[in-house]
Amino acid sequence: MKVKALILSSMFALAGCDKMGQNAQDALPNPSAAQEQAAEQAYAAFKSIDFEQLYTYFEPELKADFIAHEHEMRKFAKSIPQQEITNKKIAAKYIEKSSDKPSLYLVSYEYAYGNKNLVKYDVGFDKAGGSNKIRKFDVKVFGASTN
């Protein structure tokens, strides 16, 4: 009986934590229309290996970092699925504040593809509703095949 009560109370506690986490996500603002558009167009440029276009969305520091590692970035961009995206959503939003770095508003997107691939795409801006220049750009591919 005590074990059942302990398990039940643990389930309620975990459900409450999940609800609190969702409320915290909902409290953060969504990206502005300009930020959303920059994020989508930057992902499309990366996916199509159009780095000249991609760099137009970046802040100077991120652009310099990409240029320094462009060969590796081009190889990785080829692994991005080329099929149509079947589902797209904002998975998470974060605000990072640090005394030694500028603030960062990070939005995590999940792009699902019909061939059972999932792309997690993190894009960072200075703040929610702020500049549409990208400060952080990270892409991860999950799945069986990229063809």
Each PLM stretch: what is its role?
Residues A91-N147:
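Exposed beta-sheet edge and beta->alpha loop/turn motif
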Residues Q37, E52-P102:
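Short solvent-exposed beta->alpha transition segments
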Residues D50, A68, K78, K127, ...:
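Non-catalytic interaction surface on structured domains
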Residues C17-S48:
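Short, low-complexity N-terminal intrinsically disordered segments enriched in polar/charged residues
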Residues M1-A15:
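Sec-dependent bacterial lipoprotein signal peptides
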